[in-house]
């Protein structure tokens, strides 16, 4: 379970443990993982803590191999880790963009590559990638995040075909708006840009902040999404895609049906991007 120190990852780890799984918790914040592991064990479960920065290939390799050593086998891999800095492309360096892809996409694919041989030897397994509704909704100031999630969605569909001969099921869980620290972290990471009066994107940042606050009023909790992930992990025949909530599917379909020019006009109005 990656990204297990908070939000969807933490909630899913707790629910998977309650469902009878022994869980391996992967994230950067070791102290927080230790607390979660102790609480899981106090409730009768078993948890292994694996501290790793998934942007680092060697740490990612070490984490999954330690997980395999600790668990003996891997029945379910949940790729949940992800982040978004909330800045314009011209305000980001290439290394910063690469770092987003390292965590949101490349680490997930690397982990699949590590567990696939083991799952094949076991006679099967299950891989669950956590995507985002943002992959269906173009937005400014989140281009690397959106791009990484679009790539993860497509990769998940291709992985499902690549691994089907060995009884390895691959599912994509697509959450809508979820009340997690992702939005706060994105705001904090770009706070210096919000405070810069010469930042040409400052007004757009405030508009997006207001939209995020409104969306969070009716957002799902991490536990809501975790229940969907557990369903994908335990279903006899898991679906290729799960949406949380169902309205996320409707939004995705609606956005996909609109001609590009109409979609641009709609989003330009929503994001208040008319010529300034």
Whereabouts are the PLM-identified features?
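Conserved glycine-rich cofactor-binding loop
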Residues: 5-6
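Substrate-binding pocket helix/loop in short-chain dehydrogenase/reductase
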Residues: 88-89, 96-98
């Amino acid at each position: 379970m990656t990204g297990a120190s908070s939000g969807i990852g933490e909630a899913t780890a707790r629910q998977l443990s309650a469902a009878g799984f022994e869980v391996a918790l992967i994230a950067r914040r070791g102290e927080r993982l230790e607390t979660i592991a102790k609480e899981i064990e106090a409730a009768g479960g078993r948890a292994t803590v694996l501290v790793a920065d998934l942007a680092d290939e060697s740490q990612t390799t070490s984490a999954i191999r330690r997980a395999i050593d600790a668990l003996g086998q891997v029945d379910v891999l949940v790729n949940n880790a992800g982040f978004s800095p909330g800045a314009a492309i011209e305000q980001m360096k290439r290394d910063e963009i690469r770092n987003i892809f390292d965590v949101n996409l490349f680490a997930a694919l690397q982990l699949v590559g590590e567990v696939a041989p083991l799952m094949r030897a076991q006679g099967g397994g299950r891989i669950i990638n956590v995507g985002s509704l943002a992959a269906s909704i173009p937005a400014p100031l989140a281009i690397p995040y959106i791009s990484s999630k679009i790539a993860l969605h497509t990769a998940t569909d291709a992985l499902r075909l690549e691994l089907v001969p060995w009884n390895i099921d691959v599912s994509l869980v697509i959450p809508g708006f979820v009340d997690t620290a992702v939005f706060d972290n994105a705001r904090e990471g770009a706070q210096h840009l919000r405070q810069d009066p010469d930042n040409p994107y400052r007004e757009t940042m405030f508009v997006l902040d207001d939209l995020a606050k409104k969306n969070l009023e009716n957002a799902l909790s991490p536990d809501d999404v975790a229940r969907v992930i557990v369903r994908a992990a335990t279903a006899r025949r898991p679906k290729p895609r799960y949406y949380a909530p169902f309205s996320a599917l409707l939004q995705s379909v609606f956005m996909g049906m609109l001609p590009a020019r109409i979609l641009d006009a709609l989003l330009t109005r929503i994001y208040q991007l008319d010529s300034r």
